[in-house]
């Protein structure tokens, strides 16, 4: 069993990483006769790197983590920081994504009549619409039906039904039979799946069936920051008319066919109409990252409705990238918290916050807004749960109510506010989702389904246990100490 583990893909990957780290550690040892010169040079370099870190753009929490590494391990930390910030692969992906955004821009134009109506309805949301459209290229749409799914089982059943209707193309991880019917099927999944879930040759296997398959951001046995930037998006597009967004992955536990951490609570939304066009472009942008040319994007677009349906409100599909210097998911969450009048209700599996998000949550609560966060009671990652609990006391004392889902694990990523605004997607309240991963979501305003999101929140809340300050203080010594220590490296979690 030991040798099987060592010579597995994961084992070999870890061994190669360790070899590279040993090289970093070994160089100073073997050059010890030049130690005085080397360490003098490294001291100067350490100061230069620290000054550089302080003056770079970015989240202060990440800066503090890097500074801690450089000061605690001057040689290793300094060399490692320089190494990871001089990688060409990261720059290539960044430049390629920027170019693809330019290519898809003509297909994601903003209808000014829609934004004029939104300004008349709610100016604050019109400002968010302007930001998402003008800074990032994500238009606001009307004429889009929304259907909310309170559990993964409902989303999966709906998705199977819609996939059966496909006549032209499907962007999803599925459907050998549909390929035989002449439907174009594309399947893209994150490279982390090949680490322990799927064979490395899985794309070739699907390609034999006629399914176009890609592994996004392959795991490679080299120390590289880009391996931190996982594709966490969940998108399904069918014929350019129907799309799915949410937290539900394609695995048995997400539809409670397999129990891992009690009942798995997850959510998703179906979009049908004009807004699906953005989902199509978001998918194709990611698909084309490692291609030389560009897609004939026009063939995947459907004609927009000519008349406006006021009853359906406004829908903005959006995506987040770690390479565009815009923290889109976090900005959407800030917007909802800062413009709420009555309440903000949140479901998230993780709670690892920077100071700005922590302050915004507490400020909203102190302003008279009912802020409630539902967390899992049975976590999937004990260490992330330990860190999350280090925020509980400050949040509760600041007026934020925290509940834990007694039946099991909450994987939903939902904000709902004031019976008229909601966002559902893949974006957790942690550093990885907000800053490091490729993510996506949909902002919904003045659509009847927002009421269903709030109804689901209340139904879920009825199954939860309210966390008190006394309970937080009395948690186990191990979890308390582990959480406080791990919080030092929270930006890496």
Language model features with spans:
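Helical hairpin unit composed of two closely spaced alpha helices linked by a short loop
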Residues: 340, 350-372, 376, 381
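N-terminal localization/anchoring segments of enzymes in phospholipid and broader phosphate metabolism
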Residues: 1-330, 335, 339, 363, ...
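Generic enzyme active-site microenvironment
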Residues: 188, 347, 374
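A short, conserved beta-strand element enriched in hydrophobic/aromatic residues
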Residues: 266, 347-348
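Short Asp/Glu-rich motifs
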Residues: 197-199, 225-226, 355-356, 383-384, ...
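C-terminal structural cap/anchor segments
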Residues: 369-429
């Amino acid at each position: 069993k030991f040798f099987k583990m060592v010579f597995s893909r994961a084992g070999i990957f870890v061994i190669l990483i360790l070899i590279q780290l040993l090289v970093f550690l070994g160089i100073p040892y073997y050059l010890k006769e030049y130690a005085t010169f080397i360490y003098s040079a490294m001291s100067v370099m350490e100061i230069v790197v620290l000054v550089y870190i302080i003056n770079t753009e970015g989240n202060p929490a990440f800066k503090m983590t890097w500074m801690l590494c450089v000061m605690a391990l001057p040689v290793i930390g300094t060399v490692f920081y320089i190494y990871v910030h001089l990688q060409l692969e990261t720059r290539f992906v960044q430049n390629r994504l920027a170019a693809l955004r330019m290519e898809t821009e003509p297909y994601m134009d903003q209808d000014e009549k829609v934004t004029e109506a939104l300004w008349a309805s709610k100016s604050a949301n019109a400002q968010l619409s302007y930001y998402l459209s003008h800074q990032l290229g994500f238009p606001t749409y009307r004429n889009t039906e929304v259907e909310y799914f309170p559990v993964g089982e409902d989303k999966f059943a709906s998705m199977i039904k819609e996939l059966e209707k496909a006549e032209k193309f499907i962007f999803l991880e599925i459907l050998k039979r549909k390929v035989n019917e002449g439907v174009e099927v594309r399947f893209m999944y994150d490279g982390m799946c090949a680490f322990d879930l799927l064979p490395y040759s899985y794309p070739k296997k699907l390609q034999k069936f006629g399914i176009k398959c890609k592994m996004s951001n392959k795991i490679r046995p080299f120390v590289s920051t880009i391996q931190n930037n996982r594709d966490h998006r969940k998108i399904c597009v069918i014929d350019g008319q129907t799309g799915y967004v949410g937290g539900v992955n394609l695995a048995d536990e997400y539809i409670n066919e397999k129990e891992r951490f009690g009942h798995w609570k997850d959510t998703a939304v179906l979009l049908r109409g004009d807004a699906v066009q953005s989902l199509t472009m978001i998918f194709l942008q990611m698909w084309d990252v490692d291609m030389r040319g560009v897609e004939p994007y026009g063939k995947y677009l459907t004609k927009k409705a000519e008349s406006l349906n006021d009853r359906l409100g406004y829908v903005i599909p959006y995506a987040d990238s770690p390479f565009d210097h815009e923290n889109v998911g976090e900005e959407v969450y800030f917007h909802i918290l800062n413009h709420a009048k009555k309440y903000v209700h949140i479901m998230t599996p993780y709670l690892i916050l920077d100071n700005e998000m922590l302050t915004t949550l507490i400020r909203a609560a102190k302003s008279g807004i009912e802020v409630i966060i539902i967390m899992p009671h049975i976590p999937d990652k004990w260490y992330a749960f330990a860190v999350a609990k280090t925020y509980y006391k400050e949040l509760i004392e600041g007026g934020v109510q925290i509940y834990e889902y007694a039946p099991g694990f909450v994987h939903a990523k939902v904000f709902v506010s004031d019976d008229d605004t909601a966002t559902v997607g893949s974006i957790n309240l942690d550093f990885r989702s907000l800053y490091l991963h490729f993510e996506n979501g949909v902002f919904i305003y003045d659509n009847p389904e927002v009421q269903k999101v709030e109804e689901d929140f209340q139904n879920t809340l009825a199954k939860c246990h309210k966390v008190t300050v006394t309970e937080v203080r009395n948690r186990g010594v191990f979890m308390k100490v582990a959480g406080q220590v791990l919080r030092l490296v929270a930006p890496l979690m």
